[in-house]
Amino acid sequence: MIAKTVSERGLLPLIDFAYQGFGHGLSEDAESIKTILRHNDEAIICNSFSKNFGLYGERVGAVSFVAGNSDAATAVQSQLKKLVRCNYSNPPRHGGSIVATILGCSELTQKWESELANMRNRIKALREQFVTTMKNTGKGHDFTFLLNQSGMFSFSGLNKMQVDQLKADHGIYIVGSGRINVAGMQESKMEKFCSAIATVLEG
């Protein structure tokens, strides 16, 4: 277990928590953090509201430090204040105010959670459609392993050469690691997308 190993080695966990709600649910996605904190007294958590609130242009997020004691909390707070002062001093408040307004109103919070659930279900459906369409290309390409993944992105297994070929021959852009933005898939273009991938896989 990672959380236990981190504790045994005296490491300070730094958790990138950018996509809460897109995996299995708001609470469910936070289980990994809860597990780490059950085994560790301290942790740094970096979370973002840019994705799950649709605020990409605002870059809204936070860094939280879970301290083992009050002295550690005070020391970290003083260092964070210095970093803030050196980097941006006073951040724009527009995006943060939007998040605060939504989370401060139960009706808006409920609506946001519902919309987030709809997006999560849409992503899941697109992933399933992709797997089915790849299977139905008639070329025996099995991508069922993607069904074990969740969230906005999936690692396709495509290598850098195949990714470059997708770009050059089919005008399809994905990152060099083969990571696909599932949320960016379109149901109406799935067959074309899968056909291009099948062609690339066959070399």
Where are these regions (language model features)?
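Catalytic PLP-binding core of fold-type I/II PLP enzymes
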Residues: 1-26, 39
